[in-house]
Amino acid sequence: KGNNRVVNIAHINDNIRNDSFKDEAFVTKVGLELGINTYIRQLNPKLKSNDESIESWARKERYKLLSEILIESNSNIILTGHHKNDQVETILKNISEKTGLFGLGGMKSVNKNLIRPLLPFTKLELMRIIDKYKIPYVDDSSNDELRFKRNFIRKKVLSPWVLNDNNIVDSIAESGANFSEYQQSLIYFINEFIQKNVSDLQNGQVLIEKKHINKLPSLAKVMVVQVLTNSLGQ
């Protein structure tokens, strides 16, 4: 209430690399030094299904555990450290995976109780602050492994691009923000259509008359389904 905010630290050790315990130890140390409650959780990569990439699996499991910690710590909001470069990498990764219009918007800065406050800042801007105030940090050694698609995009696509155009990160991020606005505008009209033409049935089922859905463009039909199944955005 008011300005009295209680901050907790959460760290998910993905156990994907041999030295991941170093990150865990660093976070634990920072929590102790600052006197902040720290919640550490472990992932078990052996539980990943064979038809799922390690990146997608780890991401899904991280957010799942963060949601559990949110409840356990009696918190209201999850804050993550994603910055503008992460956003651009996400957009390019989504393009490669044919996610369509929704993927072009990238990550949402606010998604229910999940907030990404650092999205407006590039990695370079944040590193300058870290250097200025001598803030300790650790690098994820797996960031150099090109077998991960995001790392390949960062090292082989985005980094050379930045050398040729130092505004490219801002340009792609701004385009992503524009696509996100287009998406929200479309969703507004899709919701109007749903309110007028969709009937709720029992057991989570819905009814849409064929004559109404057939009037919509192909993309709008897809969006109706996505809105109804709550599968929009990240």
Task: Give the predicted meaning of each segment.
Residues 136-138, 166-172, 186-188:
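Short, structured loop/turn "capping" segments at alpha-beta junctions
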Residues 1, 8-12, 43, 47, ...:
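AMP-forming adenylation/ATP pyrophosphatase catalytic core
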Residues 1-159:
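Core alpha/beta nucleotide-donor-binding catalytic domains of modification enzymes
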Residues 154-172:
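Conserved anion/nucleotide-ligand pocket segment
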